[in-house]
UniProtKB/Swiss-Prot annotation:
Gene Ontology biological-process annotations: fusion of virus membrane with host plasma membrane; symbiont entry into host cell
UniProt name for this protein: Entry-fusion complex protein OPG086
GO cellular component, one term: membrane
InterPro entries linked to this entry: Poxvirus_G3
Induction info: Expressed in the late phase of the viral replicative cycle.
Assembly and interaction partners: Interacts with OPG099/L5. Component of the entry fusion complex (EFC) composed of OPG053, OPG076, OPG086, OPG094, OPG095, OPG099, OPG107, OPG143, OPG104, OPG147 and OPG155. Except for OPG095 and OPG053, each of the EFC proteins is required for assembly or stability of the complex.
Source species of the chain: Fowlpox virus (strain NVSL)
Membrane topology summary: Single-pass membrane protein
Length: 103
């Protein structure tokens, strides 16, 4: 019985290591891309949906640029720049769904 528990404990530790330190989740792959070209410095190109009204949305490629000095994120979509101030809670609430819907 003890050998059985020790084997499962070692198996549990190996699985914890694998899921924690290997590239298994989408966030880790997105933050540290291996061969992902769109990243260049602090801007990223992705496809997402932008909600213009309650029932209308537009989908297409967007370019997100983060400016750490002014704490802003500028989203360029079809020639229109949308500026989100990360200090403002309402702007963050508008930006998060766009980032979550990106493919």
């Amino acid at each position: 019985m003890t050998l059985f528990l020790v084997i499962f404990f070692i198996l549990f530790l190996l699985l914890c290591y694998f899921f924690s330190f290997k590239r298994t989740n989408k966030m880790e792959i997105g933050i540290n891309p291996i061969k992902k070209i769109p990243w260049s410095d602090n801007e990223h190109i992705f496809v997402s949906s932008l909600f213009t009204n309650k029932d209308k949305y537009l989908t297409g490629p967007m370019r997100l640029t983060y400016r750490p000095d002014s704490k802003t994120a500028v989203l360029d979509f079809k020639g229109t720049n949308y500026t989100y101030y990360l200090d403002n809670f309402d702007d963050v609430r508008k930006l998060v769904p766009t980032l979550l819907l990106s493919k």
